[in-house]
Design a protein with these regions (language model features):
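Positively charged
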Residues: 1-218
Length: 218
């Protein structure tokens, strides 16, 4: 199965899934995603990357392929710069800020709600997949790097990265200003502020309490 490389098509936010009503479709998508991950030797793959605009993806945990439906990030810790590639943007590398310790919630293909704590590479891959579901690409928000960057001095690389991080902050403030002008935007910003409180620990999230007996999917 071919991977979608049309960046315009991938810039659309994916639709949430009613697992109960769309159960057969969800199972079919999961099979297609897993087959594509195996075929191309990927760490992960989202439904939009195979031309299906639904909120689900598969992550390859050392050969154990897990399916995540309607996934969200409930809480985050830590921060680091991640060097990433994307099968939809072949031949290019990017630097992207990521949290390295996250609590997540999602549904299995059977509709069961589960929660997990992901750290390190697993956390970064999950965030990469969430970006795809939100129509956000590395080429939009990442810092593209090449041999010139690799061969630069450490001081030069730090300067480039700092300029990139400052530009991200400016973009975020511009988006927030635009959102404040609409009712929908105000509601979204209210949700963002709530999540920021969660991230700062002002509101606690207990994955064990939210999903007792969470197991593996499929």
């Amino acid at each position: 199965m071919d991977i979608v490389i049309d960046l315009e098509a991938l810039s659309v936010r994916a639709d949430e899934i009613n697992v109960r009503k769309e159960n057969k479709e969800v199972r079919d998508i999961a099979v297609k995603l897993k087959n594509a991950v195996r075929e191309h030797g990927l760490a992960s793959l989202s439904a939009p990357q195979i031309g299906i605009n639904k909120r689900m993806f598969v992550i390859n945990f050392n050969g154990d392929l897990r399916t995540f439906v309607n996934p969200i990030i409930a809480n985050v810790k830590g921060f680091e710069l991640s060097q990433e590639t994307c099968s939809s943007i072949p031949g290019k590398r990017f630097i992207r800020p990521r949290h390295n310790d996250i609590n997540v919630m999602y549904q299995t293909p059977l509709g069961k709600i589960e929660s997990k704590r992901l750290v390190g590479m697993a956390a970064k891959v999950y965030q990469h997949c969430i970006d795809h579901l939100d129509g956000l690409l590395l080429s939009d928000v990442g810092l593209e790097i090449d041999e010139l960057f690799d061969n630069a001095t450490e001081e030069e690389r730090v300067e480039v990265i700092n300029m990139y991080l400052e530009s991200l902050d400016i973009k975020q403030k511009a988006v927030e200003k635009d959102l404040e002008g609409t009712d929908e935007g105000k509601r979204l910003l209210s949700g963002v502020k709530f999540m920021e409180k969660v991230q700062k620990g002002e509101i606690e999230f207990d994955p064990e309490q939210e999903s007792e007996g969470a197991g593996t999917d499929e």
